[in-house]
Amino acid sequence: MATFPASLLILNGKGADNQPLRDAIGLLRDEGVEIHVRVTWEKGDAQRYVDEARQLGVETVIAGGGDGTINEVSAALIQCQGGNVPALGILPLGTANDFATSAGIPEALDKALKLAIAGNAVAIDIAQVNDKTCFINMATGGFGTRITTETPEKLKAALGGVSYFIHGLMRMDTLKPDRCEIRGENFHWQGDALVIGIGNGRQAGGGQQLCPGALINDGLLQLRIFTGEELLPALFSTLTQPEENPNIVDGASAWFDIQAPHEITFNLDGEPLSGQEFHIEILPNALRCRLPPDCPLLR
């Protein structure tokens, strides 16, 4: 274990009192592994800690938190200039952990930590919106975005990813589709969308497989649109007979342009972005990530 490379863990402030994590880090340190720990408090901390990690010369920056933390650390890493950019490690500590789950990251802290420190580093894609904001997992629009942003923190803490589904059922009366136009490579669609998922990864909202065919190293974004007037029948049909569902539109492209006559909001791995025009493109091989050898998101 003493030969493991040095790493810096960027820990979401909500996980600072995680005793099992403290114990796991302590055991690794006792075995000679060099692990620096930094805790985020406010927006911009991840960028500062990534800069510090490069100064320390560590080989891995570990994102300890949920999808939002992973996204923030990833966005900071792709801003690095020059060589010796650390790889990304993932320690799933959030409510839903959608990206980590679909990537096959172990749930056990000790196993996830060892993978994050010494796993094989693979080049993966990341998505960029309007030439500035990034997401590593998925951009969701429509009803799903409102649910994930409005679900109470206490409900998420008590029930985890299931809380999104429960809160969604409670808010069905507010369901309204968003009219928009979406263009991509050999793709064009215009109409009313209940839910829009644009995935580099596969799932969002606590385990919902919105883009089940997505891969994180194929240079493509996967698109899925739920249309129609009723959301529950569309979702049920997706689970039972997705290939026969007329209310589902699928597409794949290295980029998508979205225009709407009114303001709509996308949730980018937990970060809301509102507007009427969105240009979303894939950045191939944008960073290296330590993943399990049988990661289902790799081609």
Swiss-Prot record:
The active site is at E271. Keywords: ATP-binding, Cytoplasm, Kinase, Lipid biosynthesis, Lipid metabolism, Magnesium, Metal-binding, Nucleotide-binding, Phospholipid biosynthesis, Phospholipid metabolism, Transferase. It is found in: Cytoplasm. GO terms for molecular function: ATP binding; lipid kinase activity; magnesium ion binding. Residues 2-133 form the DAGKc domain. Its main location: cytoplasm. Binds 1 Mg(2+) ion per subunit. Ca(2+) may be able to substitute. Its cofactor is Mg(2+); Ca(2+). One of its GO terms (cellular component) is plasma membrane. ATP binds at T40, G66, D67, G68, T69, I70, N71, E72, T95. Its EC number is 2.7.1.-. Belongs to the diacylglycerol/lipid kinase family. YegS lipid kinase subfamily. Probably phosphorylates lipids; the in vivo substrate is unknown. This is Probable lipid kinase YegS-like. It comes from Citrobacter koseri (strain ATCC BAA-895 / CDC 4225-83 / SGSC4696). The lineage of its organism: Bacteria, Pseudomonadati, Pseudomonadota, Gammaproteobacteria, Enterobacterales.
